[in-house]
């Protein structure tokens, strides 16, 4: 097994962490040098710069899945490539929960009454308890979302490409049954990974079957759904609310209709962020480097 020289672009390693990696036999480089053969990076940097980068033996991306990188690229021919699954589960589940509760607790209304200096008690707050929730995609993030919502007493069903057992959902259905059943849910959360099978899966026809009181949340890639249809449904008030963290164009152009929708909350691709991620990222990287040096399969390995 060749020795590794690591460039960590995404995570600034502290002296203690560098010392731990050194004990494994991994040298840390502060810059991208020609003899670097291991990298921890975001997908976008790799996608844009692979042609100019050295050939790698070890690659870990700072995302759960990979949808931006060509795994067959010559610079990755001999590389073991993995993701950082498990790092972002908790912040993303809390993101979804906080925004759904914000709708049910009328946070936007009360924020406006405070700005207007108006005392307007509302009796229209709702509980998450008893609501029917569909979690589409039961990977680690979707499972954490289901766990979080079930704790609040919601009736959670899961939709997944393959059968899976989970104590946090009442029932697991195949993705193919979404068209028949999606209209019954008051909250729909999309947590799917993007690939050839899932691109456009939240189709025009499927979106039009959403319940009129549905809160629709997408923390997967924007390519999973038809944005134009969602805009139409929100403009015409045919669904209650939407929460979006990813978009077909980022940054979102100022002329985009999403900016002016009153029944939409949008955030700039930050649902995964948390200062607690930093330690989880290092532990994920450390574990995978350790497995690589032991010639064992990495966690969340893609090739």
Outline where the language-model segments fall.
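N-terminal glycine-/charge-rich "phosphate-binding" loop or analogous flexible N-terminal tail
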Residues: 1-41
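Short acidic low-complexity segments
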Residues: 25-35, 48-49, 170-185
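Phosphate/diphosphate ligand-binding glycine-rich loop within oxidoreductases
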Residues: 37-111
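Rossmann-like dinucleotide-binding domain for NAD(H)/NADP(H)
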Residues: 81, 213, 219-303
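A charged, well-structured terminal subsegment
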Residues: 99-124, 276, 280, 284, ...
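Glycine-rich NAD(P)-binding loop of Rossmann-like domains
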Residues: 110-144, 171
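NAD(P)-binding Rossmann-fold cofactor-contacting core
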Residues: 151-168
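Rossmann-like adenosine-cofactor binding region
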Residues: 163-257
